[in-house]
Amino acid sequence: MDPTPQSHPILAYVLSRLPSLLPVSPSLSTPRARDIEQPSPRAPSGAAEFDLVSRMPGLRHPSVLSAMTRAVADVSSARDALRLLGPRPDHELVDSARAFLRSHAAEEAEEEEEDEKVAKSREVVRLDEAHESYGGLLREAEERLDRVYRTAMRGRDMQVVAAAHGGGGEEEAGVVDDEVVRVLRDAEEGKAVERLLLADRQLRHLPEQLGRIRGLLVLDVSRNQLKNVPDAIGGLEHLEELRLASNALVSLPDSIGLLTSLKILDVSGNKLRSLPDSISKCRSLVELDVSYNVLSYLPTGIGQEMARLEKLWVHLNKLRSLPSSVCEMRSLRLLDAHFNQLRGLPAGIGRLAALESLNLSSNFSDMRDLPASFGDLLGLRELDLSNNQIHALPDCFGRLQRLERLRLDQNPLAVPPKEVVAGGVGAVKEYMARRWRDARAEEERRGSAVAESPRVSTPKEWLVRSVSSLGSWVSDVTRYGAGQDKAAAEEEEDAYLQQNL
């Protein structure tokens, strides 16, 4: 919840110098359960602070600090309010709450139990929205402090600037590249334009008119200074390749979901905090690279419609979990999720039957085990699990007989033992295959023992058999009695006839 030196360096520095703005929360002083979506706050980094002061020496000036204090007073009050409300709910819980509210509105349920669930769902959504607003407030405060500092360094009246909360600022006008102008002109004249390569042009702005180039197949604006992508990009209905790597993007427009012909999307090396839910509508995607960003989650339904996706790079982010819909990417051959904060994999990961390369390295103390379905990844050839906290590989690991490359170093492994790991991938495969066979044999032995053991009847079965036996006995008695009556009747009839004669 608190700003960190990595995400908001100036704001974290100012708050660390103001004890009155940092009330101690009881919840932070007591142990709490490990939470995938809400990790424990980390202590400020001294190295990061030293680097910040080296770049901005004026931060030590009392007048600068005083001006900055007034500029961020709203952050303190907002944070206190959020601490009372509680931690932010995880993304999948919020999506579930929103979906329930939509269905409830459509069905107009009136049961008391449903009303209680509606209230809880609304609380989840409101809490998430409050945290989202707080995140925006932190970003605005960081920019505000930067303007206060720059103004102070120019010798202006800092009290006026702080009171205005950073109003004004120098906006940099977007300058359209000559090449873009030429291409737009050609498109207006009816000329076919299929490729637009604008990498390394120091572009800060893309014009809305770009969305009118209907025949465009490839757009490369990598390694520029773009902070946003125009909504009009959704008009490029035939676009197959979009490269936005190494810019300053903090978000992508929802209209990106209209690019249904898109096969390659590269947004690596930006400042993306989230991806739009609409990205799952890019059904033709074959390669998706969202690495080197600050993503803390992926859209809940990202895998539901990406049946053709073959390569997914999500490394060097802050992901704490992968949504279960990732398991629906049945064509996925490569998944790279190293250097995140993953605490596990979805239970259905084994459904990725086409997966050949999987990198889960360097999730450090967060990654501790593998799910039982991991042994279903029979096509896996390359696996990197190094730099984690895995103590034992599951017995089903012995099924991965196609493995050619395996890294397990920097794990506190007990199964397999270190000497086996030192023998390489072949030794590990042989050891785990033997454990798998032994586990299967033991399971079959137990199954046979259960099948051969005398079966204890349940009270219901005993009663059914008793009633059946009683019914048979009554039937026999009835037949016997009927026979006796018939014989007596015949004897009486014979005696009567003889008397008459």
Swiss-Prot record:
SUPFAM superfamilies found in the cross-reference section: L domain-like
Any Pfam family hit: LRR_14
PROSITE patterns on file: LRR
Coiled coil ranges: 104-147
InterPro entries noted in UniProt: Leu-rich_rpt (IPR001611), Leu-rich_rpt_typical-subtyp (IPR003591), LRR_dom_sf (IPR032675), LRR_domain-containing (IPR050216), LRR_R13L4/SHOC2-like (IPR055414)
Keywords, comma-separated and alphabetical: Coiled coil, Leucine-rich repeat, Repeat
GO terms classed as biological process: intracellular signal transduction
Known tissue expression: Preferentially expressed in panicles.
Top-rank taxon, per record: Eukaryota
Residue numbers spanned by region Disordered: 25-47, 482-501
Motif GVYW in this chain: 424-436
LRR repeats: 190-213, 214-236, 237-259, 260-282, 284-305, 306-329, 331-352, 353-376, 377-402, 404-423
Keyword Cell membrane: no
UniProt similarity note: Belongs to the SHOC2 family.
Role description: Leucine-rich repeat protein that likely mediates protein interactions, possibly in the context of signal transduction.
Protein name, per record: Plant intracellular Ras-group-related LRR protein 2
Lineage: Eukaryota, Viridiplantae, Streptophyta, Embryophyta, Tracheophyta
